Amino acid sequence: MADLNVVTLISIGSHPASGRPRRAEQDARAVELGLQLAGEKLNVVHAGDPQEETLRAYLGMGLPGLTVLEQSREADALPALAEHLQLAKAQLVLTGTQAETGEGSGMLPYLLAERLGWPLIVGLAEVESIDGNTAQVLQALPRGQRRRLRVRLPFVASVDSAAPAARQSAFGPARRGTLELSLIHI
């Protein structure tokens, strides 16, 4: 699976008690799953402010860097993300289930899959194997049940809370990691 082009989309979260910016919990699970699949070759993308210090919490998970598609807080992330994913030739796109800040409708994975014309897996718990252009995955269902699915590449998947928990963010790697600014013209 090392040759697989995995992209994880991240956002800025909000602490439930204090409201302070933090690493979004579901997005961090998506990064963890991406790291298990692609290691340091994982591409992590954020659409928003490149000066957001909270992005370093994701770098602290062991990422050498991440890409920021610069845009205002009010801008729709969908067009920029779709164009970036097509240019990057992504094969597997991992997202959280719902943003913790902003609109937080949970529609991004659905709209992104529709725009790209790719299948969508909701509630991804694990990617078991990838054989050629097909992946075998486990989808989380209510009451701890799982469903094994086969899906063609490329596809979009929203990661469930049943996926592996995200590792802690370490200060050193968070400071050493790089933020690459990418300009997408829509």
List each language-model region with its residue ranges:
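N-terminal beta-strand-loop-alpha-helix module at the start
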Residues: 1-47
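A glycine-rich helix N-cap at a beta->alpha junction
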Residues: 53-84
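Conserved acidic residues
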Residues: 64, 91, 154
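Short beta-strand-loop elements within alpha/beta enzyme cores
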Residues: 89-101
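Conserved small/polar residues in nucleotide/adenosyl-binding loops
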Residues: 184-186
